């Protein structure tokens, strides 16, 4: 209900599955792992929700000019959440995306991606009991904390984060 209250109809989820999208988010357009939303040259457009994979590592191939996700994390690899957030932020700054909500359960991102602190963030007081996208099961006890980052609509001027604060303050601490 919080995501819907903030964004309304979602135009894009660049990191999803058909099953999860049909069951929960109902974004108008999604990219699956096979579609490779991270590396697509098609601009991301519209109101966007993004919850990228938080495990494994991403490494950049100079030869291909693309990111590759894997479990090993060899070489100069990066946290997937950071790579996905950077793509989201780029599309938002280009005004392809009017507003976006990013969710991650990787706390390391708070340290290695300082640009997130330029946006309103919600750190919930309770851990999210996440639903596994393949099997639709939840763990009896949530295993990690998560946080939301809001890339706001710019047409609202100085009040751009007010709606986010109003909606998400019921979940936890808002940092602006």
Predicted feature locations:
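Class I S-adenosyl-L-methionine-dependent methyltransferase catalytic core
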Residues: 1-176
């Amino acid at each position: 209900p919080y995501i819907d209250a903030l964004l309304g109809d979602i135009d894009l989820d660049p990191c999803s599955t058909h099953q999860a999208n049909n069951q929960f988010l109902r974004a108008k357009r999604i990219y699956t792992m096979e579609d490779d939303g991270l590396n697509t040259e098609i601009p991301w457009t519209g109101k966007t929700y993004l919850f990228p994979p938080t495990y494994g590592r991403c490494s950049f191939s100079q030869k291909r000019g693309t990111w590759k996700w894997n479990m090993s994390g060899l070489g100069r690899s990066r946290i997937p959440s950071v790579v996905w957030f950077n793509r989201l932020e780029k599309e938002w700054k280009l005004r392809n995306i009017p507003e976006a909500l990013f969710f991650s359960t990787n706390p390391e991102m708070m340290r290695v991606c300082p640009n997130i602190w330029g946006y309103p963030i919600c750190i919930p007081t309770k851990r999210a009991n996440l639903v596994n996208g393949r099997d639709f099961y939840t763990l009896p006890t949530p295993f990690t904390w998560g946080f939301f980052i809001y890339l706001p609509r710019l047409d609202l001027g100085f009040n751009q984060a007010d709606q986010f604060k109003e909606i998400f303050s019921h979940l936890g601490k808002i940092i602006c």
